[in-house]
Amino acid sequence: MSNPFLKQVFNKDKTFRPKRKFEPGTQRFELHKKAQASLNAGLDLRLAVQLPPGEDLNDWVTVHVVDFFNRVNLIYGTISDGCTEQSCPVMSGGPKYEYRWQDEHKFRKPTALSAPRYMDLLMDWIEAQINNEDLFPTNVGTPFPKNFLQAVRKILSRLFRVFVHVYIHHFDRIAQMGSEAHVNTCYKHFYYFVKEFGLIDTKELEPLKEMTARMCH
């Protein structure tokens, strides 16, 4: 039986933006393969996120940040036709949580935006971070900057907000496509990873606290 969610994922018109990949033959490509092999083997996600012996933490984090960016991008891309200026005039996670956009360019102060506008700015911003050689060096031997993990925390905290919005405001669409299991697995993978390395503040996780307690016990 075909899965409509997977059809949406692989429909080029629905793909939010091109996937960032690792160059074959590089250390990160090998790490990415190792991480994917663990997932495909059905390894407990708590174990799958742990740093493999002898590997560099920053490289391991880089591989996962890129992977999560690609996966969350696809998840949002599949429900984006139902996330409009009219349906989601404010980027939020239910009535208690509103997310305002701030950057170093146009929005220097936290600014209320519609969810689709926020998402567009967010994905552009993360893509720029990932492609910044000073922050995510691709050459072997080039050291990571001292603020690397601090920058990653900001990226992952903002990516988490996509999960919040999708789960709270668009879960009916996810259910309609029969893709709860896929999205839940992506979420659990993300959650176990950020918890393993302390990459998101507990208060940022609050909006999905009850769901997470049920899902990630």
UniProtKB/Swiss-Prot annotation:
SMART domains: Mob1_phocein
Molecular function, one GO term: metal ion binding
Keywords per UniProt: Metal-binding, Zinc
Residues reported to bind Zn(2+): C83, C88, H165, H170
Name of a matching Pfam family: Mob1_phocein
Family annotation (InterPro entries): MOB_kinase_act_fam, MOB_kinase_act_sf
SUPFAM superfamilies: Mob1/phocein
Disulfide bonds: none
Family stated for the protein in its record: Belongs to the MOB1/phocein family.
Function: May regulate the activity of kinases.
Protein name per UniProt: MOB kinase activator 3A
Provenance organism: Pongo abelii (Sumatran orangutan)
Lineage summary: Eukaryota, Metazoa, Chordata, Craniata, Vertebrata
Gene: MOB3A
